[in-house]
């Protein structure tokens, strides 16, 4: 017998509040996966399971069309006290992206038999190296459309994301010295800063006429070096996060990085090694696909305003499926994208 559910606003908010109280940084999402599995069971989903990497997958409805509703369960590190203030709910992941994920859960639950099939997925590691979506894509899900849950606001549809290359750069110098006589040895941290600045200059040059949102950016995000406060460091590890706009390939960026590291290493006469931590190609969806048109009409019907198509400067799970499967895809969800990753994250 077909089941019908009415989800009240209070119940939806309480469900999100419970999800926010589960601390789920990347690759520590099991508690939320178990929570969602129970909710899916209560809401009449079938084939509820977690895959080999920890993604939660459940199915509702039947027949065609088949659509994937996919959000991520992980958040960036850092706890925020879950609390209500006026019309807002604060908490880590409220905007990015447990809010959109729970919205998708209830949207999928409304699917009725023989009107189409909805595959609901909560992925792991979106904020890390995209382990979840890469595994899901490798399994080639049987879907005709895909919507990814990320904060865009109700009147915006995300059609494009930058790509990403993250590199680890390791600098080794021959010797160390007492901090009171720094001229006796090269300083690995100082050398690392020279490498980072040179690589940044090489990658970011020639973009004077581009808008900021369309520029390639190279950002130093981590640096580790030194054994003692009074000894010059022999080793230094740093991480560079490089965001790549549509129209530039990861391969071309890697070639520039490789050449720059070799040239700087030779000039500075220090050992330098780099490795690729993560690589995701940029992606932009078709602006006039059936999915974009249908979502636009739905927003017009509810909000009485035509939504704006936007490109984001980050990188999302949409990149992976968009570049791998020939199906219409978009990203959409409640929340302010500028609140993501902040100490005042709210929805």
Named regions from a protein language model:
Residues 48-49, 89-97, 308-313:
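Active-site nucleophile and cofactor-binding loops and adjacent substrate-binding regions
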Residues 64-122, 343:
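Active-site metal-coordination/substrate-binding segment of hydrolases
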Residues 98, 102-166:
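Acidic/histidine-rich catalytic neighborhood of metal-dependent amide-processing enzymes
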Residues 7, 152, 159, 165-347:
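Metal-dependent amide/peptide-bond hydrolase catalytic core
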Residues 66-68, 89, 144-148, 166-168, ...:
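Short glycine-aspartate micro-motif
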Residues 23, 40, 58, 69-72, ...:
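Buried hydrophobic positions in well-ordered alpha/beta secondary-structure cores of metabolic enzymes
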Residues 18, 106-113, 194-201:
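Short glycine/serine- and small hydrophobic-enriched flexible loop segments
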